[in-house]
Amino acid sequence: MKDEKVAVVTGAARGIGQAICEQLLEDGFHVVGLDISPVEWSQSPNLSSYQVNLCEAAAVSEVVDSIVAKHQRIDVLVNNAGITRDALLPDMLEQDWDSVIDVNLKAVFLLTQRVAPVMLEQGAGSIVSISSIVGTDGNIGQSNYGASKGGVIAMSKGWAKEFVRKGAQIRVNCVAPGFIATDMTKSLPEKVIQMMESKTPLGRMGSAQDIANGVAFLASDKSAFITGQVLKIDGGLVL
């Protein structure tokens, strides 16, 4: 349907990205999931997907062109895809620095660079990028991850100012998750999980749905007067 709102979500194959897609589907969007892996968790007619390496500019341009050709619009962009390659600074390999910066920061730049003109032509849109409390407050052993997520916040604040210069109602915000239960955290020792839960005032790890709820709010008209902000969803871990 031409009037159906379209949301593009990266890192859509599993975890937080899948939860975001499911929530936006429930909210009535047609969701386009992007991932380097196949998106196979649903056969909904309101979900379409593309396998794409978002670190390659040509591939990003091609997939955005395909989305616009099919749907004629992009109302929401959720930059969610991300990786970690943790190590203390003396032990961090250059390739681990590069790969995290490429996926977590460069890919956000490349995709937003291609989607923003679509939203500018429409005169409206919402861009939500997943940052992290590591991007706002840092963490031992995550120099690369912290730099990438801090960079996402800085870019988003700049874009919040840039994209509205000619009157377009394009909002740009970030969500900064705290300690979230995902496939990535399942391998952590129980002692580590208990330590993080004890440091969190609400006394538990967050869920992928907690993040999806925040993204859905920022994607919706309920947040129509919110832009350039970082929504921390961390159970009070960082106060």
Q: Which residues are covered by each model-predicted region?
A:
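Active-site helix of classical SDR
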Residues: 112, 148, 156
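C-terminal substrate-recognition "lid" of short-chain dehydrogenase/reductases
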Residues: 109-112, 120, 204-233, 238
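Short, small/polar-rich loop/turn modules that mediate ligand/substrate recognition or access, typified
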Residues: 164-171, 226-228
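Residue(s) in the substrate-gating loop at a strand-loop-helix junction
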Residues: 132
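Alpha-helical segment proximal to the catalytic Tyr-Lys
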Residues: 117, 157, 161-165, 224
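Substrate-binding pocket helix/loop in short-chain dehydrogenase/reductase
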Residues: 88-89, 96-101, 127, 185, ...
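The beta1-alpha1 cofactor-binding region of Rossmann-like NAD(H)/NADP(H)-dependent oxidoreductases
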Residues: 52-62, 94, 209-210
